[in-house]
Swiss-Prot record:
Part of the ribosomal stalk of the 50S ribosomal subunit. Interacts with L10 and the large rRNA to form the base of the stalk. L10 forms an elongated spine to which L12 dimers bind in a sequential fashion forming a multimeric L10(L12)X complex. Forms part of the ribosomal stalk which helps the ribosome interact with GTP-bound translation factors. It comes from Oceanobacillus iheyensis (strain DSM 14371 / CIP 107618 / JCM 11309 / KCTC 3954 / HTE831). GO terms for biological process: translation. Coiled coil: none annotated. One of its GO terms (cellular component) is cytosolic large ribosomal subunit. One or more lysine residues are methylated. This is Large ribosomal subunit protein uL11.
Length: 141
């Protein structure tokens, strides 16, 4: 019989930098998970993606064992990296902070495809373009 799930924890952690300090420690401590075990496993699995923020979904079972799934970095993080900016615009409808080329958007959309519920790359590109627009980033052809 399958183990019973008692908690689902969703976090966004910098790749290769999970440690027992907040926010990781308290979130997993409440669920009774071996925090160091998770940190070591997460860091080993994400060391090749240094500098990115990785969303992770941790499933905690009744016997306090756990499994976790890493997702692709958020579109906003990938767009900021592509545009070379620290943060998006406070007023995206008035102030444009940067611009990215359409082929960069396509690259980001292809990276995000496994996590988006888009039928094809064009639909994924439109989602990424919407994120860019709400951050004050213009798209150039």
């Amino acid at each position: 019989m399958a183990k019973k799930v008692i908690k689902l924890v969703k976090l966004q952690i910098p790749a290769g930098k999970a440690n027992p300090a907040p926010p990781v420690g308290p979130a997993l401590g409440q669920a009774g998970v071996n925090i160091m075990g998770f940190c070591k496993e997460f860091n080993a699995r994400t060391q090749d993606q240094a500098g990115m923020i990785i969303p992770v979904e941790i499933t905690v079972f009744e016997d306090r064992s756990f499994t976790f799934i890493t997702k692709t970095p958020p579109a906003a993080v990938l767009l900021k990296k592509a545009a070379g900016i620290e943060s998006g615009s406070g007023e995206p409808n008035k102030n444009k902070v940067a611009s990215v080329k359409r082929d960069q958007v396509k690259e980001i959309a292809e990276t995000k495809m496994p996590d988006l519920n888009a039928a094809d790359v064009d639909a994924a590109m439109r989602m990424v373009e919407g994120t860019a627009r709400s951050m004050g980033i213009t798209i150039e052809d």
